[in-house]
Structures are given as C-alpha cells and as structure tokens.
Amino acid sequence: MTLINHNKGKEQATATASYPTANYPTANYPTDSIDWLTRLIAFDTVSRHSNLALIEDVQAYCEQLGLTVDLTFNDVKNKANLFVTVPAGANADDVNHGLVLSGHTDVVPVDGQEWTSEPFTATIRGDKLYGRGACDMKGFIACALTLLPQAVKLSNAGQLRRPLHLALSFDEEVGCLGAP
C-alpha cells in the first residue's frame, strides 16, 4: 500500500492498493478504516457473485478476536449473512438487546459504467477514495471492523454495558434478499 500525505495545500496524491482475494483469509488484518476499506473493495461482491470470500475473511478476523460467528446461507450456499456479538462486559452471557451495526456486503454491477480507475481497487485521488462500494456500504463495514477490537477490549475489561452486534447481509442491492 502506498502511504499518502493528506495535508491540505500539499501536492495531490494518487494511490492504489488491491488485495488478491485468493490469499484470504489471513492473520494480517488492517488496523485502520482506510486499509480495511481498501481490503473490502478488493472483494468483487457484485450481487450476481458470491460474497463468501469477504464473509470468510471477516469471519476469520472475528474469530481471531475471540468472537463466535454465526453464518446463514442462501439456498445454493454461495452467499452468506454474518452475525457476531461482542457480549456485555459485566455479564458475558448477556447477548440480548444492545446495539446492532448492520450493513450489506453486495454492491451494484459496474457493467456499462465508465470508471477512470479499476472499480475493485481502492484509489485515492486528492482527499477522496474511489472504489465500488466505498460509500454503499463497505465504508461503514470498514469503520465497524476497525472499532471491533476496541469493543472486545471493553467487553473483556467488564466495561461494555450492552452487547454490540455486527450483522452483514447479502443481496441488499437486489431487494434485500439476504436480510432476515
């Protein structure tokens, strides 16, 4: 990944980074939201394709944090929803209620669209990051994944007052088919 100086008034920088999905999951996970977003954009999760590579990568990350992941699959088992809970710290058995961070993993197709950069490679031009799903909704997922270790730390210290849930679904772009 190319490091970029985002200071205003400096020369505009352009950087690209991609992660080959064949090498996932991996033990080397990002620690900031831009690197997470770069990683997530590299997964081609257009609604007509499987989202399993992305889901399995997030699953391995969550399990590395000591969390239990529940997956629910579509009928043909090529797409999955992911649900994970960080329990309330004071009562590790308390997984009810709390806050759900919910997002979808699929993106709309790029067919017939003119891109000035590869849509499944995060590209930073100036102070903007471009890539399919950057705003809808892999950016949100990147932020949630970046903060997940902090929630686990708070839970382990007995300081997370309510459970925190992360729910990732498939096929929102084609009628919310993956939403329970």
What are these regions (language model features)?
Residues 137-180:
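Acidic/histidine-rich catalytic neighborhood of metal-dependent amide-processing enzymes
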Residues 2-15, 19-20, 24-134, 153-160, ...:
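Acidic/His- and Gly-rich active-site-bordering loop/insert found
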